[in-house]
């Protein structure tokens, strides 16, 4: 018990608070059931028809059933401890909420007349999976603790599975759309972030003479430093970083 508590306390700050919010949402769902889901889950007919826009945010934190809560909390624990130190706490939180809200928004657009509540952080968690594949594409993970895959392969495999289920399993289309859109929006968010305007402006300012080596911008140098640290993490794990290297990684992530 003490080991589990120590492990929880060692989680990055935002990851820890998000996990607690999942737990609170699960307890509230146990107490209030369908009433909570109706008002604070994502009910497309109410979100679009009555402009209950708060549902785009609140549905993320409600979980129905112990295993629904455990799965999303486990995925948050597994991914958040790698991503939050790299992205920085504020950007990590913005990214998580963006993926959840964007996934909910697309769900409403696709099924505006649906009266079935959609609840849970799966859309946002799938966005974290996209980020994991983005930052650690070649890191080995084990699907069902048996099958070795790279992070990129895992993201592609789960995307294919969700797409197949949306076509073949009756009644699962809305939830699968939420999962898939969270993954897609997460990837697009990060790809858009690589188009760094600072790098672009630096390139415009530099008028290079023939044969002159291009100067690296400060942003490019910082990105290279971050890449070196990320490579070290992918090979030896997060624990291999010194306190100074970890602080530098947090600083570089906070600028993104």
Feature-to-residue mapping (PLM):
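C-terminal tails and terminal domains of large nucleic-acid-associated
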Residues: 226-256
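A detector for small-residue-rich transmembrane helices and their helix-helix packing motifs
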Residues: 1-230, 236
């Amino acid at each position: 018990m003490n080991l589990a508590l120590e492990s929880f306390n060692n989680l990055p700050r935002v990851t820890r608070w998000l996990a607690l919010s999942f737990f609170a949402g699960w307890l509230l769902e146990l107490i209030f059931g369908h009433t909570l889901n109706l008002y604070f889950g994502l009910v497309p007919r109410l979100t679009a028809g009555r402009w209950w826009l708060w549902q785009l945010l609140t549905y993320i934190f409600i979980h129905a059933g112990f295993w629904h809560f455990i799965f999303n909390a486990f995925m948050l624990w597994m991914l958040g401890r790698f991503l939050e130190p790299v992205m920085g706490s504020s950007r990590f939180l913005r990214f998580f909420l963006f993926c959840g809200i964007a996934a909910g928004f697309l769900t409403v657009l696709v099924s505006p007349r649906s009266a079935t509540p959609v609840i849970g952080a799966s859309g946002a968690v799938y966005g974290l999976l996209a980020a994991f594949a983005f930052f650690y594409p070649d890191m080995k993970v084990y699907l069902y603790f048996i099958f070795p895959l790279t992070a990129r392969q895992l993201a592609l495999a789960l995307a294919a599975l969700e797409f197949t289920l949306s076509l073949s399993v009756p009644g699962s289309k809305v939830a699968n759309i939420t999962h898939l859109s969270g993954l897609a929006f997460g990837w697009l968010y990060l790809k858009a972030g690589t188009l760094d305007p600072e790098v672009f402006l630096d390139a415009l300012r530099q008028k290079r003479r023939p044969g002159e080596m291009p100067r690296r911008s400060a942003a490019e140098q910082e990105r290279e430093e971050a890449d070196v640290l990320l490579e070290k993490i992918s090979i030896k794990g997060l624990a291999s970083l010194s306190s100074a290297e970890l602080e530098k990684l947090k600083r570089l992530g906070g600028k993104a």
